[in-house]
């Protein structure tokens, strides 16, 4: 009798095989977890899938607001917005910067003062930054005003993500970088230079990693650091890096930003934690979307006194030469959504749910094999349409 009970509880000769056959016959992508329900490994795989389900569900009504247009002469940050809504759930709306300026002009001084006080309370800063009447204080004040305006318009529209563009700032006196940093920390997706796909992907990254300890951020391949086996990529942007990845308390500073309107600009300055993570991006290849994921290791950066921005320094797996070459061959963006907590498995599940291509660059990647994979994928995704 006992043997029969054990067999009944664990037998799958008919149930999962039959169901698996039916779903395979229907050409349905899905995750298969094999293991006892009390095993930690099986529970972990299911937990990963559940987090991805939550992120996927959140994306299905995701509104991304583009304040201004794309950065000029940049193709990779744009894409087919109709296909993006059909495949990924993203709805992308354009909002003239002047509409945001109307919100900005309507912000009350008392609310700005409260926000400025919050800045000085939460972040390290030079004492002279609190001196009213100075240009630096005015920049902090205007940054607070811009943050309040952004919060209000995002709430009114129901947007979960947004983009800005330093080429399209209207009457603003500085790019709203400080506001973008703080809004990312609270879960709003952000993409610079009109990059709505990365803005949406960051929102999903943040959503899937809720309750995890290490953090995530929008990042950009800023500059290459060639140093033998320690060759790495400096990850930064003009300003917009999320404080969730900061190693220590961020410092509020005001410095000149010569990109865009060339003005003194408030920002949070910090360096990232050390440790392993994954960087992800989605690109539009014309006939499909491709998710590119690279395992990376964030290392300690030397002081960068002439680059007062938030930053991370990472070595892409398996090393800079192979990792960067593979990323370029795959058509990857210079923007990514980065997480210390998520693993490749999360993005595999996400790609399965979305029904999109995924390529992984990790410690086992070689250029010759990676090229073969890209070529085979090209054929597969053309033929796969005929099977659906």
Kindly label every feature range from the protein language model:
Residues 261-388:
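Extended hydrophobic packing segments that form well-structured cores
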Residues 9-44, 171-227:
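Anion-binding alpha/beta catalytic cores of soluble intermediary-metabolism enzymes, centered on
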Residues 2-6:
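Short, small-residue-biased leader/transition segments that mark boundaries at the very start
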Residues 116-211:
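Long, internal scaffold/assembly segments composed of regular secondary structure
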Residues 92-95, 165, 212-220, 360-365:
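Flexible, glycine/charged-enriched surface loops at secondary-structure junctions
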Residues 79-87, 178-181, 353-356:
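Short, solvent-exposed amphipathic alpha-helical segments in soluble enzyme
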């Amino acid at each position: 009798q006992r043997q029969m009970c054990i067999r009944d509880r664990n037998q799958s000769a008919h149930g999962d095989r039959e169901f698996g056959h039916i779903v395979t016959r229907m050409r349905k992508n899905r995750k298969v977890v094999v293991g006892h329900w009390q095993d930690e490994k099986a529970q972990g795989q299911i937990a990963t899938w559940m987090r991805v389900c939550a992120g996927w569900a959140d994306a299905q009504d995701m509104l991304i607001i583009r304040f201004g247009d794309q950065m000029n002469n940049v193709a990779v940050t744009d894409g087919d917005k109709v296909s993006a809504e059909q495949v990924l759930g993203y709805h992308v709306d354009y909002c003239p910067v002047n509409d945001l300026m109307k919100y900005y002009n309507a912000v009350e001084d008392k609310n700005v003062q409260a926000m400025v006080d919050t800045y000085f309370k939460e972040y390290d800063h030079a004492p002279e930054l609190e001196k009213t009447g100075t240009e630096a204080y005015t920049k902090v004040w205007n940054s607070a005003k811009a943050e309040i305006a952004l919060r209000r318009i995002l709430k009114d529209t129901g947007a979960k993500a947004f983009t800005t563009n330093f080429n399209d700032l209207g009457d603003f006196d500085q790019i709203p970088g400080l506001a973008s940093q703080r809004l990312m920390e609270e879960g709003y997706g952000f993409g610079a230079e009109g990059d709505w796909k990365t803005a949406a992907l960051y929102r999903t990254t943040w959503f899937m990693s809720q309750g995890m300890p290490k953090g995530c951020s929008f990042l950009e391949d800023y500059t290459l650091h060639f140093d033998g086996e320690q060759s790495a990529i400096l990850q930064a942007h003009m300003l917009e890096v999320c404080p969730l990845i900061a190693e220590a308390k961020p410092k509020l500073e005001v410095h000149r930003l010569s990109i865009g309107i060339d003005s003194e600009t408030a920002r949070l300055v910090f360096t990232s934690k050390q440790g392993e993570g994954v960087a992800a991006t989605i690109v539009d290849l014309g006939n499909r979307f491709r998710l590119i994921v690279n395992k990376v290791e964030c290392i300690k950066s030397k002081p960068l006194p002439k680059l007062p921005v938030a930053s991370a320094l990472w070595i892409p797996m398996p090393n800079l030469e192979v990792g960067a070459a593979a990323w370029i061959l795959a058509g990857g963006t210079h923007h990514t959504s980065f997480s210390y907590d998520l693993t490749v498995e999360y993005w595999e599940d996400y790609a399965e749910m979305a029904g999109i291509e995924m390529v992984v660059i990790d410690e086992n990647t070689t250029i010759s094999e990676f090229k073969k994979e890209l070529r085979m994928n090209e054929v597969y995704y053309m033929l796969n349409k005929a099977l659906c």
